[in-house]
Amino acid sequence: MKIKTRFAPSPTGYLHVGGARTALYSWLFARNHGGEFVLRIEDTDLERSTPEAIEAIMDGMNWLSLEWDEGPYYQTKRFDRYNAVIDQMLEEGTAYKCYCSKERLEALREEQMAKGEKPRYDGRCRHSHEHHADDEPCVVRFANPQEGSVVFDDQIRGPIEFSNQELDDLIIRRTDGSPTYNFCVVVDDWDMEITHVIRGEDHINNTPRQINILKALNAPVPVYAHVSMINGDDGKKLSKRHGAVSVMQYRDDGYLPEALLNYLVRLGWSHGDQEIFTREEMIKYFTLNAVSKSASAFNTDKLLWLNHHYINALPPEYVATHLQWHIEQENIDTRNGPQLADLVKLLGERCKTLKEMAQTCRYFYEDFAEFDADAAKKHLRPVARQPLEVVRDKLAAITDWTAENVHHAIQATADELEVGMGKVGMPLRVAVTGAGQSPALDVTVHAIGKTRSIERINKALAFIAERENQQ
Protein backbone atom coordinates (compact mmCIF):
# COMPACT_ATOMS: atom_id res chain seq x y z
CA MET A 1 0.00 0.00 0.00
CA LYS A 2 1.33 3.41 -0.94
CA ILE A 3 1.33 5.82 2.00
CA LYS A 4 -0.34 9.13 1.30
CA THR A 5 -0.75 11.96 3.80
CA ARG A 6 -2.13 15.45 3.52
CA PHE A 7 -1.93 18.87 5.10
CA ALA A 8 -5.26 20.65 4.84
CA PRO A 9 -5.23 24.16 6.33
CA SER A 10 -8.14 26.58 6.26
CA PRO A 11 -7.01 29.89 4.70
CA THR A 12 -8.50 32.16 7.34
CA GLY A 13 -5.12 33.41 8.64
CA TYR A 14 -1.38 32.82 8.52
CA LEU A 15 0.37 29.47 8.91
CA HIS A 16 0.88 29.22 12.67
CA VAL A 17 3.40 27.01 14.44
CA GLY A 18 0.77 24.42 15.39
CA GLY A 19 -0.22 24.01 11.76
CA ALA A 20 3.41 23.96 10.68
CA ARG A 21 4.16 21.14 13.12
CA THR A 22 1.17 19.15 11.83
CA ALA A 23 2.37 19.70 8.26
CA LEU A 24 5.88 18.64 9.26
CA TYR A 25 4.70 15.43 10.92
CA SER A 26 2.54 14.55 7.89
CA TRP A 27 5.41 15.34 5.53
CA LEU A 28 7.92 13.32 7.57
CA PHE A 29 5.60 10.31 7.81
CA ALA A 30 5.12 10.28 4.04
CA ARG A 31 8.83 10.71 3.34
CA ASN A 32 9.77 8.04 5.90
CA HIS A 33 7.57 5.52 4.05
CA GLY A 34 8.48 6.63 0.55
CA GLY A 35 4.94 7.94 0.14
CA GLU A 36 3.30 11.12 -1.10
CA PHE A 37 2.32 14.35 0.62
CA VAL A 38 -0.71 16.34 -0.54
CA LEU A 39 -1.49 20.02 0.07
CA ARG A 40 -5.20 20.80 0.21
CA ILE A 41 -6.71 24.21 0.90
CA GLU A 42 -9.98 23.80 2.82
CA ASP A 43 -11.60 27.08 1.82
CA THR A 44 -15.28 26.23 2.27
CA ASP A 45 -15.63 29.12 4.76
CA LEU A 46 -16.18 31.65 2.01
CA GLU A 47 -16.62 34.60 4.37
CA ARG A 48 -13.33 34.11 6.23
CA SER A 49 -11.08 32.59 3.56
CA THR A 50 -8.80 35.11 1.84
CA PRO A 51 -6.25 35.04 -1.00
CA GLU A 52 -3.77 36.69 1.38
CA ALA A 53 -4.10 33.79 3.82
CA ILE A 54 -3.57 31.26 1.02
CA GLU A 55 -0.42 33.12 0.00
CA ALA A 56 0.78 33.21 3.62
CA ILE A 57 0.30 29.44 3.93
CA MET A 58 2.23 28.83 0.70
CA ASP A 59 5.00 31.19 1.80
CA GLY A 60 5.34 29.37 5.11
CA MET A 61 5.43 25.93 3.51
CA ASN A 62 7.97 27.04 0.91
CA TRP A 63 10.18 28.76 3.49
CA LEU A 64 10.25 25.54 5.52
CA SER A 65 10.87 23.55 2.30
CA LEU A 66 7.93 21.24 3.00
CA GLU A 67 7.39 20.47 -0.67
CA TRP A 68 4.17 18.74 -1.69
CA ASP A 69 3.75 16.04 -4.31
CA GLU A 70 0.14 16.90 -5.21
CA GLY A 71 -1.89 20.05 -5.05
CA PRO A 72 -2.64 22.52 -3.92
CA TYR A 73 -6.24 21.38 -4.24
CA TYR A 74 -9.02 23.85 -3.43
CA GLN A 75 -12.33 22.66 -2.02
CA THR A 76 -14.22 25.56 -3.60
CA LYS A 77 -13.26 24.15 -7.01
CA ARG A 78 -14.76 20.75 -6.18
CA PHE A 79 -18.32 21.70 -5.20
CA ASP A 80 -19.77 19.87 -8.21
CA ARG A 81 -18.10 16.67 -7.06
CA TYR A 82 -19.34 17.03 -3.47
CA ASN A 83 -22.90 17.71 -4.57
CA ALA A 84 -22.86 14.75 -6.94
CA VAL A 85 -21.95 12.49 -4.03
CA ILE A 86 -24.67 14.05 -1.86
CA ASP A 87 -27.25 13.46 -4.60
CA GLN A 88 -26.10 9.85 -4.80
CA MET A 89 -26.53 9.49 -1.02
CA LEU A 90 -30.04 10.94 -1.22
CA GLU A 91 -30.93 8.30 -3.80
CA GLU A 92 -29.43 5.53 -1.69
CA GLY A 93 -31.12 6.69 1.50
CA THR A 94 -27.92 7.41 3.44
CA ALA A 95 -28.84 11.10 3.47
CA TYR A 96 -32.15 12.98 3.65
CA LYS A 97 -33.58 16.46 3.25
CA CYS A 98 -34.43 18.38 6.41
CA TYR A 99 -37.01 21.18 6.30
CA CYS A 100 -36.94 22.11 10.00
CA SER A 101 -36.92 25.85 10.57
CA LYS A 102 -34.31 27.67 12.62
CA GLU A 103 -37.03 28.46 15.14
CA ARG A 104 -37.91 24.79 15.63
CA LEU A 105 -34.28 23.77 15.96
CA GLU A 106 -33.61 26.52 18.51
CA ALA A 107 -36.68 25.54 20.53
CA LEU A 108 -35.54 21.90 20.43
CA ARG A 109 -32.09 22.90 21.61
CA GLU A 110 -33.44 24.93 24.53
CA GLU A 111 -35.78 22.11 25.56
CA GLN A 112 -32.96 19.55 25.53
CA MET A 113 -30.65 21.80 27.51
CA ALA A 114 -33.37 22.46 30.08
CA LYS A 115 -33.60 18.69 30.60
CA GLY A 116 -29.82 18.44 30.95
CA GLU A 117 -29.55 16.58 27.65
CA LYS A 118 -26.87 17.05 25.01
CA PRO A 119 -28.33 19.22 22.19
CA ARG A 120 -28.75 17.16 19.03
CA TYR A 121 -31.15 16.90 16.11
CA ASP A 122 -34.11 14.62 16.91
CA GLY A 123 -34.39 13.10 13.43
CA ARG A 124 -37.88 14.43 12.71
CA CYS A 125 -37.36 14.79 8.94
CA ARG A 126 -35.47 11.50 8.76
CA HIS A 127 -38.73 9.64 9.35
CA SER A 128 -41.11 12.17 7.79
CA HIS A 129 -43.20 11.35 4.73
CA GLU A 130 -44.55 14.88 4.27
CA HIS A 131 -44.61 16.25 0.73
CA HIS A 132 -42.57 19.40 0.08
CA ALA A 133 -42.29 21.61 -2.97
CA ASP A 134 -39.09 21.22 -4.96
CA ASP A 135 -38.11 24.84 -4.31
CA GLU A 136 -38.77 24.75 -0.55
CA PRO A 137 -35.56 25.60 1.35
CA CYS A 138 -33.92 22.65 3.04
CA VAL A 139 -30.63 21.27 4.21
CA VAL A 140 -29.35 17.75 3.60
CA ARG A 141 -28.40 15.64 6.60
CA PHE A 142 -26.36 12.46 6.80
CA ALA A 143 -28.37 9.55 8.20
CA ASN A 144 -25.95 8.61 10.94
CA PRO A 145 -26.23 5.02 12.28
CA GLN A 146 -28.47 5.02 15.35
CA GLU A 147 -26.98 2.00 17.07
CA GLY A 148 -23.54 0.66 17.85
CA SER A 149 -20.36 2.67 18.13
CA VAL A 150 -17.43 3.98 16.12
CA VAL A 151 -14.02 2.69 17.16
CA PHE A 152 -10.74 3.75 15.62
CA ASP A 153 -7.16 3.03 16.60
CA ASP A 154 -5.53 6.44 16.92
CA GLN A 155 -1.83 6.02 16.11
CA ILE A 156 -0.87 8.43 18.89
CA ARG A 157 -3.61 7.97 21.49
CA GLY A 158 -4.62 4.36 21.07
CA PRO A 159 -8.21 3.06 20.64
CA ILE A 160 -10.96 5.70 20.80
CA GLU A 161 -14.67 4.87 20.86
CA PHE A 162 -17.77 6.99 20.29
CA SER A 163 -21.34 5.80 20.72
CA ASN A 164 -23.49 6.53 17.67
CA GLN A 165 -26.19 7.71 20.04
CA GLU A 166 -23.91 10.65 20.85
CA LEU A 167 -23.71 11.66 17.19
CA ASP A 168 -26.61 13.45 15.54
CA ASP A 169 -27.44 13.60 11.85
CA LEU A 170 -24.83 15.97 10.52
CA ILE A 171 -25.78 18.64 7.97
CA ILE A 172 -23.78 17.92 4.82
CA ARG A 173 -25.38 20.51 2.51
CA ARG A 174 -26.65 23.95 3.49
CA THR A 175 -29.80 25.64 2.25
CA ASP A 176 -27.72 27.64 -0.25
CA GLY A 177 -26.54 24.39 -1.84
CA SER A 178 -22.98 24.53 -0.50
CA PRO A 179 -21.51 21.39 1.09
CA THR A 180 -20.20 21.55 4.66
CA TYR A 181 -16.64 21.15 5.89
CA ASN A 182 -16.95 17.70 7.46
CA PHE A 183 -18.44 16.26 4.29
CA CYS A 184 -15.93 17.86 1.92
CA VAL A 185 -13.08 16.43 3.99
CA VAL A 186 -14.49 12.92 3.64
CA VAL A 187 -14.87 13.09 -0.14
CA ASP A 188 -11.43 14.66 -0.52
CA ASP A 189 -9.71 11.99 1.56
CA TRP A 190 -11.54 9.35 -0.46
CA ASP A 191 -10.82 10.82 -3.89
CA MET A 192 -7.20 11.65 -3.06
CA GLU A 193 -6.62 8.16 -1.63
CA ILE A 194 -5.32 9.48 1.69
CA THR A 195 -4.12 6.57 3.81
CA HIS A 196 -3.10 8.43 6.97
CA VAL A 197 -4.74 11.54 8.43
CA ILE A 198 -2.40 13.33 10.85
CA ARG A 199 -4.03 16.39 12.38
CA GLY A 200 -4.63 18.32 15.60
CA GLU A 201 -6.51 16.86 18.54
CA ASP A 202 -9.26 19.46 18.05
CA HIS A 203 -10.47 17.22 15.18
CA ILE A 204 -11.01 14.11 17.31
CA ASN A 205 -14.76 14.74 17.60
CA ASN A 206 -15.01 15.06 13.81
CA THR A 207 -13.41 11.67 13.23
CA PRO A 208 -16.36 9.35 14.11
CA ARG A 209 -18.69 11.42 11.94
CA GLN A 210 -16.28 11.25 9.03
CA ILE A 211 -15.74 7.51 9.48
CA ASN A 212 -19.49 6.89 9.38
CA ILE A 213 -19.84 8.87 6.16
CA LEU A 214 -16.92 6.99 4.60
CA LYS A 215 -18.53 3.67 5.50
CA ALA A 216 -21.85 4.82 4.04
CA LEU A 217 -19.99 5.53 0.80
CA ASN A 218 -18.25 2.13 0.92
CA ALA A 219 -14.99 4.09 0.89
CA PRO A 220 -11.77 2.97 2.63
CA VAL A 221 -11.24 4.47 6.08
CA PRO A 222 -7.80 6.04 6.57
CA VAL A 223 -5.65 5.63 9.66
CA TYR A 224 -5.97 8.57 12.07
CA ALA A 225 -3.43 10.22 14.36
CA HIS A 226 -4.30 13.24 16.46
CA VAL A 227 -1.48 15.47 17.65
CA SER A 228 -1.74 17.26 21.00
CA MET A 229 -1.90 21.02 21.19
CA ILE A 230 0.99 23.39 21.81
CA ASN A 231 0.89 25.50 24.96
CA GLY A 232 2.88 28.56 25.90
CA ASP A 233 5.51 28.24 28.60
CA ASP A 234 2.82 29.25 31.12
CA GLY A 235 0.77 26.13 30.35
CA LYS A 236 -1.96 28.04 28.51
CA LYS A 237 -2.86 27.55 24.85
CA LEU A 238 -0.27 29.16 22.59
CA SER A 239 -1.39 32.59 21.43
CA LYS A 240 -0.01 35.92 20.29
CA ARG A 241 0.71 36.94 23.86
CA HIS A 242 3.42 34.27 23.98
CA GLY A 243 5.26 35.95 21.11
CA ALA A 244 5.29 35.16 17.42
CA VAL A 245 2.96 32.37 16.36
CA SER A 246 3.14 32.87 12.58
CA VAL A 247 5.79 30.89 10.74
CA MET A 248 6.74 33.89 8.61
CA GLN A 249 7.00 36.05 11.72
CA TYR A 250 9.83 33.79 12.82
CA ARG A 251 11.46 34.38 9.44
CA ASP A 252 11.04 38.11 9.97
CA ASP A 253 12.52 37.84 13.47
CA GLY A 254 15.69 36.27 12.13
CA TYR A 255 15.23 32.54 12.59
CA LEU A 256 16.51 29.98 10.12
CA PRO A 257 14.00 27.44 8.76
CA GLU A 258 16.30 24.61 9.91
CA ALA A 259 16.08 25.88 13.49
CA LEU A 260 12.30 26.16 13.47
CA LEU A 261 11.87 22.72 11.87
CA ASN A 262 14.26 21.13 14.37
CA TYR A 263 12.39 22.81 17.21
CA LEU A 264 8.95 21.84 15.93
CA VAL A 265 9.83 18.19 15.34
CA ARG A 266 11.01 17.90 18.95
CA LEU A 267 7.89 19.64 20.22
CA GLY A 268 6.06 16.41 20.98
CA TRP A 269 8.34 13.83 19.34
CA SER A 270 11.64 12.37 20.47
CA HIS A 271 14.33 9.97 19.37
CA GLY A 272 16.34 9.05 22.44
CA ASP A 273 18.12 12.06 23.90
CA GLN A 274 19.05 13.55 20.54
CA GLU A 275 18.29 17.27 20.23
CA ILE A 276 19.83 18.29 16.90
CA PHE A 277 18.36 16.68 13.77
CA THR A 278 19.18 17.19 10.13
CA ARG A 279 16.26 16.96 7.73
CA GLU A 280 17.53 13.55 6.64
CA GLU A 281 17.63 12.32 10.24
CA MET A 282 14.09 13.54 10.87
CA ILE A 283 12.88 11.53 7.88
CA LYS A 284 14.85 8.46 8.91
CA TYR A 285 13.76 8.34 12.55
CA PHE A 286 10.23 9.77 12.56
CA THR A 287 7.46 7.45 13.77
CA LEU A 288 3.98 8.23 15.05
CA ASN A 289 4.32 5.95 18.07
CA ALA A 290 7.09 8.23 19.36
CA VAL A 291 4.77 11.26 19.36
CA SER A 292 3.63 12.26 22.83
CA LYS A 293 -0.03 12.27 23.88
CA SER A 294 0.62 15.22 26.20
CA ALA A 295 0.52 18.88 25.26
CA SER A 296 3.88 20.48 24.53
CA ALA A 297 5.14 23.77 25.95
CA PHE A 298 6.64 26.26 23.52
CA ASN A 299 9.96 27.59 24.82
CA THR A 300 11.35 30.55 22.91
CA ASP A 301 14.71 30.33 24.69
CA LYS A 302 15.18 26.79 23.39
CA LEU A 303 14.31 27.90 19.86
CA LEU A 304 16.78 30.76 20.19
CA TRP A 305 19.48 28.32 21.31
CA LEU A 306 18.80 26.13 18.28
CA ASN A 307 18.89 29.13 15.96
CA HIS A 308 22.26 30.20 17.32
CA HIS A 309 23.51 26.65 16.79
CA TYR A 310 22.38 26.56 13.16
CA ILE A 311 23.78 30.02 12.37
CA ASN A 312 27.20 28.63 13.26
CA ALA A 313 26.77 25.01 12.14
CA LEU A 314 25.39 25.53 8.63
CA PRO A 315 27.66 26.65 5.77
CA PRO A 316 28.14 30.45 6.01
CA GLU A 317 27.33 30.78 2.31
CA TYR A 318 23.91 29.23 2.94
CA VAL A 319 23.19 31.31 6.04
CA ALA A 320 24.14 34.37 4.02
CA THR A 321 21.31 33.69 1.56
CA HIS A 322 18.84 34.08 4.43
CA LEU A 323 20.75 37.02 5.93
CA GLN A 324 20.42 38.91 2.64
CA TRP A 325 16.70 39.47 3.22
CA HIS A 326 17.34 41.02 6.64
CA ILE A 327 20.12 43.21 5.24
CA GLU A 328 17.65 44.52 2.68
CA GLN A 329 15.09 45.24 5.41
CA GLU A 330 17.70 47.39 7.16
CA ASN A 331 18.51 49.21 3.88
CA ILE A 332 22.22 48.47 4.20
CA ASP A 333 24.36 48.87 1.08
CA THR A 334 26.80 45.94 1.20
CA ARG A 335 28.79 46.79 -1.93
CA ASN A 336 31.68 48.19 0.12
CA GLY A 337 32.51 45.72 2.84
CA PRO A 338 32.91 42.03 3.60
CA GLN A 339 31.01 39.31 1.77
CA LEU A 340 27.90 38.24 3.68
CA ALA A 341 29.32 34.75 4.19
CA ASP A 342 32.35 36.34 5.88
CA LEU A 343 30.03 38.50 7.95
CA VAL A 344 28.26 35.34 9.17
CA LYS A 345 31.64 33.99 10.31
CA LEU A 346 32.41 37.28 12.05
CA LEU A 347 29.14 37.74 13.90
CA GLY A 348 27.85 34.18 14.24
CA GLU A 349 29.11 33.66 17.77
CA ARG A 350 27.71 36.98 19.00
CA CYS A 351 24.31 37.01 17.28
CA LYS A 352 21.47 34.61 18.03
CA THR A 353 19.27 35.75 15.14
CA LEU A 354 19.85 37.00 11.62
CA LYS A 355 17.85 40.11 12.43
CA GLU A 356 20.25 40.91 15.25
CA MET A 357 23.14 40.30 12.87
CA ALA A 358 21.71 42.68 10.28
CA GLN A 359 21.05 45.34 12.90
CA THR A 360 24.60 45.23 14.28
CA CYS A 361 26.64 44.96 11.08
CA ARG A 362 26.12 48.40 9.56
CA TYR A 363 29.56 49.71 10.60
CA PHE A 364 31.18 47.12 8.33
CA TYR A 365 29.58 48.75 5.30
CA GLU A 366 28.64 52.33 6.10
CA ASP A 367 30.23 55.13 8.10
CA PHE A 368 28.48 56.02 11.34
CA ALA A 369 27.43 59.57 12.15
CA GLU A 370 28.61 59.56 15.76
CA PHE A 371 30.20 57.38 18.40
CA ASP A 372 28.21 55.59 21.06
CA ALA A 373 28.09 58.17 23.86
CA ASP A 374 28.95 55.83 26.73
CA ALA A 375 31.72 54.07 24.82
CA ALA A 376 33.25 57.36 23.68
CA LYS A 377 33.10 58.87 27.17
CA LYS A 378 34.95 55.87 28.58
CA HIS A 379 37.51 55.15 25.86
CA LEU A 380 37.98 58.18 23.58
CA ARG A 381 39.78 60.26 26.19
CA PRO A 382 42.97 62.31 25.80
CA VAL A 383 44.99 59.39 27.16
CA ALA A 384 43.90 57.37 24.11
CA ARG A 385 45.34 59.85 21.61
CA GLN A 386 48.88 58.44 21.50
CA PRO A 387 47.85 54.75 21.22
CA LEU A 388 45.48 55.63 18.38
CA GLU A 389 48.12 57.66 16.52
CA VAL A 390 50.71 54.90 16.81
CA VAL A 391 48.37 52.07 15.82
CA ARG A 392 47.06 54.15 12.92
CA ASP A 393 50.57 54.56 11.54
CA LYS A 394 51.34 50.87 11.96
CA LEU A 395 48.11 49.89 10.22
CA ALA A 396 48.89 52.31 7.39
CA ALA A 397 52.27 50.63 6.93
CA ILE A 398 50.79 47.17 6.37
CA THR A 399 51.31 46.04 2.77
CA ASP A 400 49.59 42.65 3.09
CA TRP A 401 46.21 43.44 4.69
CA THR A 402 45.38 40.34 6.74
CA ALA A 403 43.79 39.85 10.15
CA GLU A 404 47.08 38.38 11.37
CA ASN A 405 49.04 41.46 10.34
CA VAL A 406 46.41 43.71 11.91
CA HIS A 407 46.87 41.77 15.15
CA HIS A 408 50.65 42.23 14.94
CA ALA A 409 50.18 45.99 14.49
CA ILE A 410 47.98 46.24 17.58
CA GLN A 411 50.39 44.10 19.61
CA ALA A 412 53.40 46.10 18.41
CA THR A 413 51.69 49.32 19.49
CA ALA A 414 51.08 47.97 22.99
CA ASP A 415 54.69 46.75 23.21
CA GLU A 416 56.12 50.05 21.99
CA LEU A 417 54.09 52.10 24.46
CA GLU A 418 54.57 49.52 27.20
CA VAL A 419 50.83 49.30 27.90
CA GLY A 420 48.34 46.44 27.99
CA MET A 421 46.48 45.41 24.85
CA GLY A 422 43.28 46.87 26.29
CA LYS A 423 44.78 50.37 26.34
CA VAL A 424 45.15 50.11 22.57
CA GLY A 425 42.32 47.77 21.72
CA MET A 426 39.40 49.50 23.41
CA PRO A 427 39.98 52.98 21.93
CA LEU A 428 40.63 51.35 18.56
CA ARG A 429 37.41 49.33 18.77
CA VAL A 430 35.33 52.44 19.51
CA ALA A 431 37.15 54.35 16.79
CA VAL A 432 36.51 51.86 13.98
CA THR A 433 33.06 50.52 15.00
CA GLY A 434 31.57 53.46 16.86
CA ALA A 435 30.59 51.12 19.68
CA GLY A 436 32.10 49.39 22.69
CA GLN A 437 31.51 45.83 21.51
CA SER A 438 32.45 43.91 18.39
CA PRO A 439 33.88 40.57 17.31
CA ALA A 440 37.62 40.01 17.76
CA LEU A 441 39.32 43.31 17.00
CA ASP A 442 41.85 42.05 14.46
CA VAL A 443 39.23 40.39 12.24
CA THR A 444 36.88 43.36 12.70
CA VAL A 445 39.48 45.91 11.57
CA HIS A 446 40.50 43.61 8.72
CA ALA A 447 36.89 43.28 7.54
CA ILE A 448 36.24 47.02 7.74
CA GLY A 449 39.25 47.58 5.51
CA LYS A 450 42.48 49.55 5.64
CA THR A 451 41.37 52.86 4.19
CA ARG A 452 38.11 53.04 6.11
CA SER A 453 39.77 52.00 9.40
CA ILE A 454 42.39 54.74 9.13
CA GLU A 455 39.75 57.33 8.24
CA ARG A 456 37.75 56.36 11.32
CA ILE A 457 40.80 56.50 13.58
CA ASN A 458 41.40 60.05 12.33
CA LYS A 459 37.78 60.85 13.08
CA ALA A 460 38.25 59.53 16.62
CA LEU A 461 41.42 61.60 17.06
CA ALA A 462 39.51 64.70 15.97
CA PHE A 463 36.81 63.81 18.51
CA ILE A 464 39.47 63.54 21.24
CA ALA A 465 41.06 66.85 20.22
CA GLU A 466 37.70 68.59 20.38
CA ARG A 467 37.12 67.03 23.77
CA GLU A 468 40.52 68.35 24.98
CA ASN A 469 39.70 71.86 23.77
CA GLN A 470 36.44 71.83 25.72
CA GLN A 471 38.20 71.02 28.99
From Swiss-Prot:
It comes from the Bacteria. Binds 1 zinc ion per subunit. InterPro entries: aa-tRNA-synth_I_cd-bd, aa-tRNA-synth_I_codon-bd_sub2, aa-tRNA-synth_I_CS, aa_tRNA-synth_I_cd-bd_sf, Glu-tRNA-ligase_bac/mito, Glu/Gln-tRNA-synth, Glu/Gln-tRNA-synth_Ib_cat-dom, GluQ/Sye. Keywords: Aminoacyl-tRNA synthetase, ATP-binding, Cytoplasm, Ligase, Metal-binding, Nucleotide-binding, Protein biosynthesis, Zinc. GO terms for biological process: glutamyl-tRNA aminoacylation. Its EC number is 6.1.1.17. A motif ('KMSKS' region) lies at residues 237-241. It catalyses: tRNA(Glu) + L-glutamate + ATP = L-glutamyl-tRNA(Glu) + AMP + diphosphate. Zn(2+) binds at C98, C100, C125, H127. The keyword Transferase does not apply. GO terms for cellular component: cytosol. One of its GO terms (molecular function) is ATP binding. ATP binds at K240. It is found in: Cytoplasm. It is an enzyme of class 6 (ligase). Its cofactor is Zn(2+). A motif ('HIGH' region) lies at residues 9-19. Catalyzes the attachment of glutamate to tRNA(Glu) in a two-step reaction: glutamate is first activated by ATP to form Glu-AMP and then transferred to the acceptor end of tRNA(Glu). Monomer. This is Glutamate--tRNA ligase. It comes from Escherichia coli (strain SMS-3-5 / SECEC). The gene is gltX.
